[in-house]
């Protein structure tokens, strides 16, 4: 039993289970917020069954992206993330590649079992994640934009093509802005390893430019945070209250660190705050829906 666990654990680690779980929650939340029920024209079936399938499809796609990224970023990770399974030798690159392919196939299969529409919709993140790992990660901003867009797409994926998906556009924009900032911070955090591997990323931009991008995106997010409830009226005061109590303090905290000229010393803390803010934002949407539903 112990040997089996030792074999399985590295495969779990390579998927970044927490990130995959957050994506799965975003998909499920999007479906719940819009009251989504898959029409017969798009495959039909029980709502609960389709919800499970689409959550699995999204989580498998996220896991695929992380696995294939580790395969192609092995040299970088030797410096930036020496504890990752491929670097430690817990998994071979061949085994990781096969595992990634299996995850991609699982994502498509689960989405197709829900509907043909979602089978097509699942191909988009898989294609973009592949492009990101092979090429876009090695660009100054394109890769950051793609990953941020895919995170926002997770909130929309489950509810498409339901017309109520429109209420998720503002939250998806917020998710995009927040994750764009997080990707910038991660690039700075991984700068040493990326340079050692000869890669060009957003971390190669001048530090004042990176700080400006963080503050601009963070500032727009701060202003837009209130749009879903106070401007559009798609969500209520519960959403606003959770944002004030949980989202806003985290947002201000990492932005204060971004203002520092030596902000690159605090990327670990900033990254943790940004991830916590993402979870808090999802919680704000969920709490509002829960209160007004029950």
Indicate where each model-derived feature is located.
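Multi-pass alpha-helical membrane architecture of UbiA-family
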Residues: 1-294
């Amino acid at each position: 039993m112990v040997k089996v666990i030792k074999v399985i654990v590295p495969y779990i680690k390579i998927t970044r289970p927490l990130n995959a779980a957050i994506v799965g929650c975003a998909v499920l939340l999007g479906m719940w917020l819009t009251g989504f029920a898959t029409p017969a024209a798009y495959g039909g079936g029980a709502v609960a069954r389709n919800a499970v399938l689409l959550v699995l499809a999204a989580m498998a796609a996220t896991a695929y992206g992380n696995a294939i990224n580790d395969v192609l970023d092995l040299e970088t990770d030797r410096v930036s993330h020496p504890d990752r399974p491929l670097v430690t030798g817990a998994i071979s690159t061949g085994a990781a590649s096969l595992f990634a392919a299996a995850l991609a196939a699982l994502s498509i299969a689960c989405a197709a079992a829900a509907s043909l529409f979602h089978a097509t919709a699942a191909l988009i993140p898989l294609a973009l994640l592949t492009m990101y790992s092979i090429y876009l990660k090695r660009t100054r901003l394109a890769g950051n934009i793609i990953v941020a867009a895919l995170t926002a797409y997770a909130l929309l994926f489950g509810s498409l093509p339901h017309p109520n998906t429109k209420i998720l556009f503002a939250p998806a924009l917020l998710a995009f802005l927040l994750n764009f900032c997080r990707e910038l911070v991660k690039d700075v955090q991984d700068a040493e390893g990326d340079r050692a591997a000869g890669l060009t990323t957003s971390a190669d931009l001048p530090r004042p430019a990176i700080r400006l991008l963080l503050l601009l995106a963070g500032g727009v997010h701060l202003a837009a945070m209130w749009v879903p409830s106070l401007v559009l009226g798609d969500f209520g005061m519960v959403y606003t209250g959770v944002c004030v109590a949980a989202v806003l303090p985290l947002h201000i905290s990492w932005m204060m660190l971004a203002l520092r000229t030596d902000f690159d010393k605090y990327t670990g803390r900033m990254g943790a705050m940004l991830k916590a803010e993402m979870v808090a934002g999802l919680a704000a949407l969920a709490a509002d829906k829960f209160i007004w539903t029950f």
